[in-house]
C-alpha cells in the first residue's frame, strides 16, 4: 500500500480506498486471534491518507458484537474519530464470510443463532477448516425462509436489524460516515432465493430509513449451487425495491476486475434500474499467494473510472494473515 501515490486528478472525484480489518469489531467468537501493533488504527489511517486514499470500508461482524459488545462499540467510536481526524469517508459493512466461525474458518453470524439449529463444526473445536457445504446450504436456505431464531424464538432478520440499528445510531452523525452496507455477500443455493434476498433487503431498509438518511449499500449475491446460477436477470432481482429517500448503491466484488466481469455487473445494474455501482472489494484474484503491484492497482482504478463507478475499496489492509 505504501507504494501508492494517488492524486485527486488521477481519481477524478471517485471514492478510492481499502477494506480495513479492525480488532474488536472483527473478532472471531470461537477462536482467538493475534494482537495488533500499537496504535494500529491511527497509524493505518494516516498511511491511507499519505497514499491518496479517501475512503475506507469497515467490515464489522455480528459474532464480534456478541463476543464483546462494549469493546465492539468502543472500537467503532475510535475508528470514526480517526476517520474524522484524517478526512476519510467510511462505509460500515455488516460482513460475513463463509457464514460463521461456529461452522468452520468463516466469520459473521453469532453463536446465539447457529447453536440452535446446528452442531458445532468440527466438534473437536478446530475452527480452521472450511465449513461443510451441506451445512452452509442448510443455513442459507433457513435464513431466506426466516426459519432461524435465537433461544427466545426471536427471528434472525429482526435480530440482525437490531444490530444494524445499534451501529447506525452510534455512527450516523459522524462527518466521516458515508453509509452502511446491509449484508456482505449473501449466498443462495436455490433459484427461488434470489427474490427472497430482495424481500430481506426490503425488510431491512423499511426500518433502517428511520435511523439514517445516508446511502444504503447492498451486496451482489454469491451463488453456491448449480441450481442457482446467477444469470444477470436473477441477480437483478436481489436488490431492495421499497421506495425510500435513501440512495441504494450496488456493491460488487470482482476478483479480478476484468472488463467482461464489470460488463456483467453493469448489465445487472441496468436491469435493476440502479446505475450506482460501488466496488466494495477487488484484488488480482482469490488464489493463495496472489500478488498485486501498484501498476496493476492503478490499471484497475482507471478501469473503474472508465465504467463511471461510484468508488472502489481494495481487499484488504490487515495485521493478520488472510486465510482467504
Give residue spans per PLM region.
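Extracellular glycoside hydrolase catalytic/binding regions
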Residues: 37-38, 148-310
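Surface-exposed, active-site-proximal loop segments in enzymatic domains
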Residues: 26-33, 62-74, 101-114, 138-152, ...
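Short catalytic/ligand-binding loop motif for oxyanion handling, primarily in non-cytosolic enzymes
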Residues: 64-67, 98-104, 108, 187-191, ...
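Structural motif
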Residues: 13-15, 53-55, 87-89, 175-177, ...
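N-terminal carbohydrate-binding accessory modules
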Residues: 1-55, 78-85, 89, 269-270
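A cross-domain feature marking catalytic cores of carbohydrate-active enzymes
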Residues: 20-22, 58-62, 92-96, 181-184, ...
